[in-house]
Amino acid sequence: MAHFPGFGQSLLFGYPVYVFGDCVQGDWCPISGGLCSARLHRHALLATCPEHQITWDPIDGRVIGSALQFLIPRLPSFPTQRTSKTLKVLTPPITHTTPNIPPSFLQAMRKYSPFRNGYMEPTLGQHLPTLSFPDPGLRPQNLYTLWGGSVVCMYLYQLSPPITWPLLPHVIFCHPGQLGAFLTNVPYKRIEELLYKISLTTGALIILPEDCLPTTLFQPARAPVTLTAWQNGLLPFHSTLTTPGLIWTFTDGTPMISGPCPKDGQPSLVLQSSSFIFHKFQTKAYHPSFLLSHGLIQYSSFHSLHLLFEEYTNIPISLLFNEKEADDNDHEPQISPGGLEPPSEKHFRETEV
């Protein structure tokens, strides 16, 4: 990645982009080989370790001289201060073709997906609602990717400030080899770093096919899975499971959910049960980053992070939102072994948009 004084090349198009947010910990210091006090600069694409007075590129590990040389310049805070040239630079290329998304996919997503902030409107290849992005130059487009024979909607908010990352969907089905229309000439290693940052910052679930990233940045391992009814938000205790967050796979028409549980009977740190977690913690937060910032949940370190996999290459849309598994009207939810009360129906029912 080329660097120039006073300018940091973005992951995508070579112009300044808000990418990683405010001082996200998790980059390894090349001197100590550990986390040290390494932090990622605010609105920068370089990491620095104040303890060792060293700055490096977190993608390829190349050590650089002065950190101040390569900080991405801040954009004006208000849209009125942004010129037409700035907006032109920040506007991503337009996708020429819009895939035909089956209406059943959007209907199921509206009805059964636990939207962040209680509301998210799918927009079929158009921009997101204007209220979410006050500046049109920073409003990304939806990205659709083919997964086997199915078309799955995926949002990559690469061109938006981190404050909008909570709008990411809960599950991202991603095949790096099929992102060429959006991420042109981007090495897999850089995509891998981007996916890790999104996962670390937003808690989004990134489901990737096995062996799709042939780099050594991650050491993928197929994590064990446990079966459970997803509406009660609880998982059996699995002491050997080290994968952070949730792995949500589908096979034989049955949702298979796995995730780390702090203690036997306690709720797993899964996004599908986020309403239940927030209810128990008596907070109005709608995003796992709130729990992460308050030390209520923990993610594994950089090298022990496992990417998420799907056992098969084809995920039919009917399996993404299984009405039988999502419908808890026919029976009362069972009390978990730990005695915690499962969330009520209202936590998992979304009103029609």
Curated annotation (Swiss-Prot):
Keyword DNA-binding in record: yes
Region span, Disordered: 326-353
PTM note: Phosphorylation at Thr-48 results in the loss of NF-kappa-B activation function. Phosphorylation at Thr-215 results in loss of CREB and NF-B responsive promoters activation. Phosphorylation at Thr-184 and Ser-336 have no effect on these Tax functions. Phosphorylation of either Ser-300 or Ser-301 is necessary for localization to nuclear bodies. Thr-48, Thr-184, Thr-215 and Ser-336 are highly phosphorylated, whereas Ser-300 or Ser-301 are only rarely phosphorylated. Modified by host ubiquitin related modifier 1/URM1, resulting in a redistribution of Tax to the cytoplasm.
GO CC field: host cell cytoplasm; host cell nucleus
GO biological process: positive regulation of DNA-templated transcription; symbiont-mediated activation of host NF-kappaB cascade; symbiont-mediated perturbation of host cell cycle G0/G1 transition checkpoint; symbiont-mediated perturbation of host cell cycle G1/S transition checkpoint; symbiont-mediated perturbation of host exit from mitosis
Subunit structure: Homodimer. Interacts with host CREB1. Interacts with host DLG1, IKBKG, KDM4A, MAGII3 and TAX1BP1. Recruits the coactivators CREBBP, EP300 and PCAF. Interaction with human CARM1 enhances Tax transactivation and promotes methylation of histone H3. Interacts with host SUV39H1 protein, leading to abrogate Tax transactivation of HTLV-1 LTR. Interaction with human CREB coactivators, CRTC1/TORC1, CRTC2/TORC2 and CRTC3/TORC3 enhances Tax transactivation. Interacts with host UPF1; this interaction inhibits the host nonsense-mediated mRNA decay (NMD).
Protein name: Protein Tax-1
